[in-house]
């Protein structure tokens, strides 16, 4: 059976993105969380709302673009893959997080350029690299091959 790891989600940033560069190599990386709202009717036919909070990580030029264009409450559409990472917390406990590693991010809010409305922004990570951070912020990476 083929393995598929693909996520597309739209939502709003819960706070400003956190931008940094890795300790080894200075590779740009940004983390942010989005809230994705879902409306549905319950068994009594009353409208209910549920919110799902999802963490997102982006690398390289995609990270820099997020730093420059996104703020708390910005609307985005994220296309990426799920990744999990585990680390030891300062208290010695093991922690695991599942987040989306972004391949493409579409900025859904219109941006102003020279006082005029601009088109929605769309940025893609075309490096074909997979990046991971260990608990000390050191990056290790591997590239995947594409048939392109």
From Swiss-Prot:
Residues 4-109 form the SSB domain. GO terms for molecular function: single-stranded DNA binding. The keyword DNA-binding applies. GO terms for biological process: DNA replication. InterPro entries: NA-bd_OB-fold, Primosome_PriB/ssb, ssDNA-bd. It comes from the Bacteria. Gene3D superfamilies: Nucleic acid-binding proteins (2.40.50.140). Keywords: DNA-binding. Pfam families: SSB (PF00436). GO terms for cellular component: nucleoid. Homotetramer. NCBIfam families: ssb. This is Single-stranded DNA-binding protein 2. It comes from Chlorobaculum tepidum (strain ATCC 49652 / DSM 12025 / NBRC 103806 / TLS) (Chlorobium tepidum). The lineage of its organism: Bacteria, Pseudomonadati, Chlorobiota, Chlorobiia, Chlorobiales. The gene is ssb2.
